[in-house]
Amino acid sequence: MNYTDKETACKQELIQLEQTGNLRGLPGIELDGKWIHLDEKKMLNLSSNDYLGIASDQKMRQDFLSNLDIDKAIFSSSSSRLLTGNYPVYQKVERLLTDLYKKESALVFSSGYHMNMGILPAIADKNTLILADKLVHASIIDGIRISSAQCIRYRHQDYRQLEELLDKHHAGFRSMIIVTESIFSMDGDVSPLPLLVQLKKKYPNTFLYVDEAHAVGVRGLNGLGIAEEEDCIPEIDFLCGTFGKAFASMGGFVVCNKIFRDYLINRMRTFIFTTALPPIQLEWSFFVLNQMINMKEERMWLRKSSQIVKEALEEKGFTSTSSSHIL
């Protein structure tokens, strides 16, 4: 296929996407706190991940900037973490995560997408079976696709099927990994993490990978997610989170044991071969993490307001399977 043929094929596919209502485009919006301005219309923003309002909190932003040492306002790491990009603030954030979660170690990544796309290919080989919920995020699916592991996607939250698969295949693989989200971004339902922990313990050499992207900051007494809420943090082998949603920053992280952390540093391609986040971004994440612990009122407000909206929608005849702030 030459260039012209490829261009024509792309054009035809774009036309088909438009005809089916699936053509994506970048909206020319202006943000104004909780409002969005688009095509001369002012609309309430109900589509962002700024769950606690931190991104639009001008006072919080000013407090951070007022107390920031100008020598730490470094806007580029200029390197990967394995070369010269591993600034001291990385260790500061990872120590705080380790202390908060009471786990052996933590590792910060350039994005949540890099995190999910890189961990599974690093730890899973051809002797590994991945059992993933049907509705896990695209970044997890992409990570599974480029891994050498075999994968079976069990029906969404069908834990009877999951147990059947564990029972059927555990003798045929060196290890198995159960992969799930704690709060599913598509429909807002919550995984029963204690049940998954129970299943993990029942079958030898089975590990549990939980993406808490939509739960960190907003669930649990200290905002550490559903795992904190259900008191099962120690039982989760790879507890993943993001700074890009409730924390109003950028990047991803995993808390795990030290051996797994060291292994990821050596084998995780999306960690090794990418430029580290700017140090000033990590300074902001560190600041927000410390603030987040005490944002219990904000978490309660989010839960109450989500329930009010859900009830209002139900009165209008809409239904929702959500048991979280995602409606």
Task: List where the protein language model places each region.
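Conserved PLP-anchoring active-site segment centered on the Schiff-base-forming lysine
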Residues: I119-A138, Y159
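Active-site phosphate-binding strand-loop segment of PLP-dependent enzymes
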Residues: I152, H156-V210
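Substrate-binding/gating loop at the entrance of the active-site cleft, primarily
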Residues: S111, L131-S147
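N-terminal "arm"/small-domain region of PLP-dependent enzymes with the aminotransferase-like
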Residues: A9-Q12, Q16-F75, T206
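Conserved N-terminal alpha-helix of the aminotransferase class I/II PLP-enzyme fold
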Residues: Q62, S66-S111
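Conserved PLP-dependent catalytic core of the aminotransferase class-I/II
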Residues: S191, F286-L327
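Active-site PLP attachment segment
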Residues: E228-Y263
